[in-house]
Amino acid sequence: MKILGIDPGTIKCGYAIIETKPKLTLIDAGFIKITEKELQYQLSQLIEGIDMIYDSSIDEVAIEDIFFAYNPKTVLKLAQFRGALSLRILQIHGNFSEYTPLQVKRAVTGNGKAKKEQVAFMVKRILGIKGDIKPLDITDAIAVAITHSQRVKC
C-alpha cells in the first residue's frame, strides 16, 4: 500500500510517499516551497505542487492537523493553506485521514511531547535511513505517513 503523508506549512509543505509491503520503505520525499508573496498565489503554488507529486498509484493520504499557535494571523493563514490542500486532495483522491501532531509524535516516538529532532531520529530508525533528512518538514511528513500505516494496519 502506498501512503502519501503531508505536513502542511505556509513556507514549506513537507510530503512523503511510503510503501508498506513487504516492509515500510520510503519511495519519495521532499517539500513544496512557497515563494509567492500574495496569499492567492501562495495557495495556487501549493496546489500546483500537490498536483506534481500526486499520482494515481497512491492508496491512502494522511495530513497532519493544524497545531496550536500563539499568533492568530499564523493560525488563520495555516487554516487557509490547510483548507486549499484538503479541497485539492478531495478532488484528486476522494478522501484523506487527519492526525494531530500529538498523535503523530506518540505513534512514531511513543511520546506525544517529543521534539522534532526526536521524531526525525525515529523516522530514520524505523525506515533504516542513514544520514540526515532536511528540512524537518520532510521527516514530519514521513512520520504522518508512518502513523497512518499503523492506524490502517497495512
UniProtKB/Swiss-Prot annotation:
Residues reported in the UniProt entry to bind Mg(2+) 1: 7, 137
Q: What is its EC number?
A: 3.1.21.10
Q: What SUPFAM superfamilies does the entry give?
A: Ribonuclease H-like
Question: What PANTHER family does the entry give?
Answer: CROSSOVER JUNCTION ENDODEOXYRIBONUCLEASE RUVC
Question: What is the protein's quaternary organization?
Answer: Homodimer which binds Holliday junction (HJ) DNA. The HJ becomes 2-fold symmetrical on binding to RuvC with unstacked arms; it has a different conformation from HJ DNA in complex with RuvA. In the full resolvosome a probable DNA-RuvA(4)-RuvB(12)-RuvC(2) complex forms which resolves the HJ.
Similarity annotation = Belongs to the RuvC family.
The name of this protein is: Crossover junction endodeoxyribonuclease RuvC
Q: What organism does the record attribute this protein to?
A: Nautilia profundicola (strain ATCC BAA-1463 / DSM 18972 / AmH)
Gene name, Swiss-Prot/TrEMBL: ruvC
